[in-house]
Amino acid sequence: MSAKQLGDLKPLFIEWLKDEIDACGPRQEKMAMVYFRARESLKRFDQPITETAKVLKVKGIGNSIKNKLASKLAQYCQDNNIPLEDAAAPSHVVGISVTRVRTATQEKDDQSPKRKKRKYVPRKRSGAYAILLGALELGCPSRGLTKEEIIDAAAKYCDVSFVSNPLTREFYSAWTAIKVLIDHDLMLEQGRPRRYIVTEAGEQMAETLKHADSVIFPEDCPYQRRQQAPESTAEDHTELSASLSELVRQEHLPQNHSGMCFSFEPPSSAPSDYLDPGQKSANVASSPHRLRPPIGPSIDIVKARWNGTSYELWKPGSYDIELYIDHREVRAKSERDFFVNALLTRGVTVEGKALALGDMVWVARHRDSRSTCVLNFMLERKRLDDLAMSIRDNRFMEQKNRLKKTGCKHIFYLVEETSGTNVAGMEGAIKTSIWMTYVYSGFHVKRTRNADDTVEWLHDMTCTVQRYYCSKSLLVLRPREIANQEDYGSLLSAFRLQFERNNTSLECCHAFDCYQEVLGKTGLMTVKELYIRTLMLNRGVSLEKALAIQSKFPTLRSLMTAFRNCKSEEDGRRMLYLALLDQPASRRVGKALAATLWDTFGRR
């Protein structure tokens, strides 16, 4: 039998990649993750693999893995007495047969020594250089790092800003270098929200850059902690799957290890899910999970997993409350930082951010890890004229629906009644909208006289939030994969149902980076949501009208097909008007709006 008769080589390659994963030791988690991602991508690859070179078409497989598979195929052919020249594998073998038909001149040219491809080395103080050093400073954890974590650590090593500014025609930032690092297999991107993992080659490159330029990291950074305790890093300790009551039990923990994070050493077959948090767990000493204090300094965070989702447990007093304000929230063009500066003078820890949703949100920042999570308090601020405009152009309902997706328990809608605001003719609509926000949406409505009054209220509210959380533990969710924005809220609800039902001293919340990536206007949108937003870009199309159109024409293609099937332009202009005549008044499309939608989607 020849190797050609093997047919599709994919099953063999999948098996060999599994062997590589199993061969990785406990200190080779990153390499195991590379092989795992390559194996999963190969499983999903729908074309047969008839030669080794074809695996380069598979996402996550580069020359290194291809060469390893080629070597294994050569060994397999040798062990099974299969002629190697028939094997549809190594690309260099195929190249030999091609060379035989070349002319003598070409063969002479080929004999000249080929220039070796230069290894990629990031330029000093460039974006790629800074990203690698920032990730190394953070310890290159196997769980990966978020974009925000990397930028916070990397900014000082780069001469270019990590934030683009289209107003000054700076369309690219230093962060775009992450694509170069991924292309050179120095970093991996995975999951949603996205996390970035430094590969073994990337870590070696970062170490080389650090020593070449004599870069000195801060004494308390994760890299230094890992150097002091190489066998047990604070960031990469084992996640436990057990009952929550066992995790938070204080009286059984050794007193001489206060302030440390106790990792749990699971048995050979750990339970897949958490037990009921309300049930009594046995003494930790008699538990099948043995407490193992880490070596050297560590961080006071318990990491665990429930129902396939990782989470962290932050104890009371281990975190601080901060207020994030969207940097687009301004008092006037000449006072863009008014709210941040005014609150800073009142002793409030506040920071301007580009928030994905909401105008202000209260977050908790862990004192040791410096990671942040979104608390159950957020605020949408509207000046009276802005509120009137949002009602008129249908942004009001859309914004409220997006706020509901957060699953936040306490959403405040603050209306600033600035003097001299012209809302003539909108008084009734404003009153109705405020009452609907309070009664039907369940939001807290707060009315202030002006921006100064808003600042005073924010100061008092921040103090209230700090008192509320002074004795609460936080269960911070860190999901690896969220399919859409609905999953964000449903996952939070599932955790609350499991952990908060009998425990008033604990609250579940998402990590801030997850909040930022998932809840953006264009983040993780379904086709249906994108279709509805496309309809709402037309002036006069409210959320109710867009939903009514979507119920009659489920997809944009079906709507455009219906327009094309109209016999005349006049029929096309009246089609949506006639199709929605049986709908309630708020969901109907008038003749003028129907004509506008025809001009947008139907006119050829």
From Swiss-Prot:
Keyword Magnesium (UniProt): yes
Keyword terms of this UniProt record: DNA damage, DNA recombination, DNA repair, Endonuclease, Hydrolase, Magnesium, Meiosis, Metal-binding, Nuclease, Nucleus
Enzyme kind, highest EC tier: hydrolase
Cofactor: Mg(2+)
One GO cellular component term: nucleus
Gene3D superfamilies per UniProt: 3.40.50.10130, Crossover junction endonuclease EME1, DNA-binding domain, DNA polymerase beta, N-terminal domain-like, Winged helix-like DNA-binding domain superfamily/Winged helix DNA-binding domain
Region (Disordered): 268-290
Any one Gene Ontology BP term: DNA catabolic process
EC number(s) recorded for this UniProt protein: 3.1.22.-
Primary residence: nucleus
Localization of this protein: Nucleus
Domain ERCC4: 322-419
Domain of life: Eukaryota
InterPro entries recorded: DNA_pol_lamdba_lyase_dom_sf, EME1/EME2_C, ERCC4_domain, Mus81, Restrct_endonuc-II-like, WH-like_DNA-bd_sf, WH_MUS81, XPF_nuclease_Mus81
GO-annotated molecular function: 3'-flap endonuclease activity; crossover junction DNA endonuclease activity; DNA binding; enzyme inhibitor activity; metal ion binding
Quaternary context: Interacts with EME1.
Family under the similarity heading: Belongs to the XPF family.
Function: Interacts with EME1 to form a DNA structure-specific endonuclease with substrate preference for branched DNA structures with a 5'-end at the branch nick. Typical substrates include 3'-flap structures, D-loops, replication forks and nicked Holliday junctions. May be required in mitosis for the processing of stalled or collapsed replication fork intermediates. May be required in meiosis for the repair of meiosis-specific double strand breaks subsequent to single-end invasion (SEI).
Protein name: Crossover junction endonuclease MUS81
